[in-house]
Structure formats: C-alpha cells, structure tokens
Amino acid sequence: MFKNLAGSFRAVSRVAFKTRPSLVRSYAAFDRSKPHVNIGTIGHVDHGKTTLTAAITKVLSEKGGANFLDYGSIDRAPEERARGITISTAHVEYQTDKRHYAHVDCPGHADYIKNMITGAAQMDGAIIVVAATDGQMPQTREHLLLARQVGVQHLVVFVNKVDTIDDPEMLELVEMEMRELLSQYGFDGDNTPVIMGSALCALESKQPEIGVQAIEKLLDAVDEHIPTPTRDLEQPFLLPVEDVFSISGRGTVVTGRVERGSLKKGEEIEIVGDFDKPFKTTVTGIEMFKKELDAAMAGDNAGILLRGVKRDDVKRGMVLAKPSTVTSHKKVLASLYILSKEEGGRHSPFGENYKPQLFIRTTDVTGTLRFPAGEGVDHSQMVMPGDNVEMEIELVRKTPLEVNQRFNIREGGKTVGTGLVTRIIE
C-alpha cells in the first residue's frame, strides 16, 4: 500500500512491571518449547480491547495457559502515572496449545498512537476489536492505518458486544463493512477471520456460545491465521531501549524488544546514544515475564541488568548493541515516500528545510529535510503528497542509525510519510 517503504518498522515493546522489577532472583527458567509471538489489541476507544484481553486470560487460566488478570490489573496506566512511572502499555503473557504469546494492550488512545508509531507496541499480528453496537469508527480506521504503516500484516477481527444485538442482519453488516475496510487499507479483507462474541459474557461465564466458546474460536484463529515470525538470530545483537529502571544494590535495568541477534548473561554490550563515543558494560542478568533467561533472543521483550551503569546514563531511544556494530549520526541520505491525502497524509506539498518529527525505533527527533547537493538540483522544487523522493536529513541530535533503517515521518499528530536510510553522510 505504501510503495516499497511501508514495510516492517522494527522496534520494541515496553515490558510492563506491576512494581519496579527485581531482576533475577529465584525465578524459574523461561520455557522456549513453544514459538513466541507478539500480539496486541487495536481498535476504537470503549469497543472492549482491555475487556477482551482480560477475557483471554480468564479462558486460558482455566486450561493452565495464563494467570487471570481482571480489567483493573491490565488498565493500570493512571495508577502508574500517579507514581511517576509512565508505563503506557500493559503486557500480558499467555499460552495456547501451540504458542507462547506476549499480548500488548494500551488503555489510552494517545498511548496507542505514540507506542504504535515508535514501534513500542510492535506486533507480529493484531486483534482488531470492533463493537457490534457501533461498527467501524474513526479510531478503528486510524489504528488500521497505523498498523499498516508499522508493518503489521496479519489481523484477526473480533466483533464484540454481540450480546446487546438482537438483529443478525446488523452483525452481517458490521462484518461486511469491516472486510471492505480491511481491503481498503491493504489487508486481506476476504480471508481475514471474523469472530463474533462478547468479552463480557466470557468474563462473567454467561452465554458460552458467544462468551467462552467465542474466545476459544478467536485464539484458534490467531494460532492459525497469524504466521509464526522468522526471527533474525544471526545478525549482531540490537535492542532499542524502551524504559530504564534503577534497582537499589543491583544496578540499572533497561527494557525493550530485541530487534535482532541474541545476548547471553556475562557478555559485553555497548550503549549507543546521542553522545560522541558509545560506552561498554557487562550484562549481569536477563529476565522476561519474571522468568530468568540464559539468553535474550530476537523478538523477546526482555529486561537487561547492566553492571556499573547509572540510571541517568541510559534513556529511551538509545540502543544496546554488540560492540562496534552500531554508531550514531546526525546527517543521512534517505529515500522517502510521502503519504497521499487519501492515505491520511498531508493535503499540501512541502519544500526544502521542512522540519518534521522522525520516529526512529523508540525515539523521536526533529530533522531538517533538504534536496541532495549536486549539479542540476532544483532547490526550489516542491514535494507532493504521494511522491517518492530522495532527500538529505539533518537531525538536531546524534541518533543510532544504520543503512536500511526504516523510520516514520510525523507532523501535527499524524504520520505523513515513511523513510529508509540509504547512506550515512556524517
């Protein structure tokens, strides 16, 4: 849909801790006997995303595949903000017979936008929740557009609140409209599974055919329709930093989703950020979902305990990387695709010295866009919505960057383009 540039926007998912993490105590080892998949709920506000997440944990808890978390346990963002910890995604762990899932639920709409665009809620697939009472709504469409932009290719639809609808034709209409909408945004509208049910009925153990049985059908559809992703384990380790904690007497923990490679306890690692020279440290512990890991691998949402690093030395947007594999830069050449008005982008063209926000992995940074220097370049030309264009980008601060690094371009609260770094200039 977005030419060749709107592929996977790789980044990390935030790990949600109920309390500050106390890494690597007497935790059991993490079981890797099943494939690990990152999934999430998207959709319009109040359509039942968090209720559905709670219902999934309830149904699976009765089979030993999850710990039941009620709505309040998942939707704890206000409590966390009051304590000064801005954990804006909730991570829930569960297992089906076939897979282990990390499920991300962002209770607030603003959190969704921020986390989907920076890739903090990067998913291998998603469940889009739509209320039978409303059908598709503005945020349904916005989240579909965002999912497409950040590289989510596989969805399952859950039509929620069917217990409040008496007219079967209304449900058919909601399904038909959703299939059309999916096709409009570049998804497989004809073959995407659409499950009808009521998350509330599942939570309250009422009307099993639209309650518990619907949740079971949904999980079967997720198992079957969302492919197990191929993880990039051969490349050098890289983890974009999502959050940082300090543990008294132990050190500093950084959390994030491993983008590629693997990391073992005791290995040396480099912290790369907006400073001139990266600094090295040693990994003293690795944890995922309160289970100890010998190694973190691509796709894991991990907490990494670092030796001799102060809390203020590391911040969101930096990366942990295998030494000498990643460097920070201020100026790059990039191939850009500017979204058309119909794709949710700008309505008007822009010229040289345009200064949007660039969302790169887990950071956002202002950049100035200019046409590359060279003979015959018209520096007064305009870039139109829908154009593919090559431009130089100068960032306001050094940022960890690589050739083939993907990023999103944002302005005024919406995505206006996508980009791919083609050359490092300085």
Swiss-Prot record:
Localization per Swiss-Prot or TrEMBL: Mitochondrion
Renumbered residue ranges of the record's region G1: 43-50
Covalent S-S links between cysteines: none
Residues covered by the tr-type G domain: 34-230
G2: annotated segments: 84-88
A GO MF term: GTPase activity
Annotated organelle transit peptide span: 1-27
PROSITE patterns in the cross-refs: G_TR_1, G_TR_2
InterPro entries: EF-Tu_GTP-bd (IPR041709), EF-Tu_GTPase (IPR050055), EFTu-like_2 (IPR004161), EFTU_2 (IPR033720), G_TR_CS (IPR031157), P-loop_NTPase (IPR027417), Small_GTP-bd (IPR005225), T_Tr_GTP-bd_dom (IPR000795)
Stretch list, region G5: 198-200
Pathway linked to the protein: Protein biosynthesis; polypeptide chain elongation
Superkingdom of the organism of origin: Eukaryota
Pfam families: GTP_EFTU, GTP_EFTU_D2, GTP_EFTU_D3
Region annotation G3: where it falls in the sequence: 105-108
Swiss-Prot/TrEMBL keywords: Elongation factor, GTP-binding, Mitochondrion, Nucleotide-binding, Protein biosynthesis, Transit peptide
GO BP annotations listed: mitochondrial translational elongation
Protein name as it appears in the record: Elongation factor Tu, mitochondrial
Native species: Meyerozyma guilliermondii (strain ATCC 6260 / CBS 566 / DSM 6381 / JCM 1539 / NBRC 10279 / NRRL Y-324) (Yeast)
UniProt gene name: TUF1
